[in-house]
Amino acid sequence: MSKVWSNRFDGSLNPFIEEFNASISFDKTLILEDIECSIAHAKMLSKTKVLSTDESLKIIEGLETIKEKFIEGKFCPGAPSEDIHYCIEEKLINLIGETGKKLHTGRSRNDQVGTDIRLWLRKKIDNIDILLYELQNSLFSIAESNIYTLIPGYTHMQRAQPLSLAHHLLAYLEMFQRDRERLKEVRARVNISPLGAAALAGTKIKIDRYFTAEELGFGNIYKNSIDAVSDRDFCIEFASSSALIMSHLSRISEEIILWVTDEFSFAKLTDKCATGSSLMPQKKNPDVPELIRGKTGRVYGHLQSLLTMIKGVPLSYNKDFQEDKEPIFDTVDTISSCLKAMTILLNEGIEFNVEKLMDSVHNDFSNATDLADYLVFKKVPFREAYQVVGDIVKYCLSKNILFKDLQLEEFQTFHNEFKEDIYENLNPMNVVKSRNSLGGTGFDQVKLELNNWKKKLFT
């Protein structure tokens, strides 16, 4: 099949180079967006009298027919077409004849592909936002049921202070909310139309860029034709936001992997979201969070690929930009599947071991800060109180006992301000309840945050 640009050349393209150069194997993903873009362009050419009404309608009807055949599975784009743009144009010409050759008037593949990928990515961002929202709902539901369930809080992966499990899960709601806000900002910059910039310099053909932008639902148009076809910063922004989403998914995945180990036993996997071993019959493997954790590197790699692709490219359009699609397509697929998998895991695949969680916070030194705070409330300087508690911890470790095992007289050998009420202050439920500063893990604060989230998510 001859190329539309082949008249400039005397010789034929090397078959391997032809295959190497082609993008149809992956940019066929954009078929519906390319048709949508072309329909808007045909309408505009009619409005500006570049095409007659009959010509425009004939082109639009042809494009709609191609769309229907694709949806019905009767048209499968592929080789020998070079890319999805030529593929559809060739199909259109075969379908409606010479009129189809007029469709490309006043545009280039450079602004065309930029429009297509923005249309595609805009839809995908909206879909990902829905998946993030559903994940937040799942986290909210578990949090709402576990206000009074305690879990050890960690710093440096060492027991630090007891927390409400709800408070712990709400931290992830905050992270995923920021992810949604970032995507919203990215979407605003994706939602700008490059159509009409042509190859790089605009066109002398009478066009109406605002008309096509409005037809396609764009919020604005690129004001500089070179910029319109020269940058893929919106792809990089999306990939960056996606990398952050995956980092948050990876962190909660890592925690779940730890929680379901025999060493932690804070939770267990249900049969719906676990697999076994081909050799070891006792195994129940956390494949879902492990896969999510593993796929995070894949999305990070796509971000690096896009950054490297763009870094040394002079203005304006270059063939390098063909390499933007596969990373973005795979990023969308990966993010979407991981978000859905995590939501299913939270809804159906994990059960918290409340007894083990409560037992854990009753049998450690995570209430040490409260021991120091007790003395602070007795007007003892904090640094002095800190040192006193450090001595008590050392003493308890030497005896293989906990604070709760000490007699009052033993406490008083370290400081005479210790009284009988010290035991009440060391109770983990009271420890958590007392952390009532704004944004803290205190039960009243957690309830306040749950109410705030209920308004955000459900109203």
Curated annotation (Swiss-Prot):
Keyword ATP-binding listed? The answer is no
The similarity annotation says: Belongs to the lyase 1 family. Argininosuccinate lyase subfamily.
Official protein name in the record: Argininosuccinate lyase
Please name the pathway. Amino-acid biosynthesis; L-arginine biosynthesis; L-arginine from L-ornithine and carbamoyl phosphate: step 3/3
For this protein, what is the EC number? 4.3.2.1
Q: Which InterPro entries match?
A: Arg_succ_lyase_C, Argininosuccinate_lyase, Fumarase/histidase_N, Fumarate_lyase_CS, Fumarate_lyase_fam, Fumarate_lyase_N, L-Aspartase-like
- Answer yes or no on keyword Amino-acid biosynthesis: yes
Q: Name one GO biological process term.
A: arginine biosynthetic process via ornithine
CDD domains, per this entry? Answer: Argininosuccinate_lyase
Which Gene Ontology terms cover its molecular function?
A: argininosuccinate lyase activity
- Pfam families reported for this sequence: ASL_C2 (PF14698), Lyase_1 (PF00206)
Keywords assigned: Amino-acid biosynthesis, Arginine biosynthesis, Cytoplasm, Lyase
User: What cellular component GO annotations does this protein have?
Assistant: cytosol
Q: Write out the catalysed reaction.
A: 2-(N(omega)-L-arginino)succinate = fumarate + L-arginine
The cellular location(s) given in this protein's UniProt record come to:
Cytoplasm
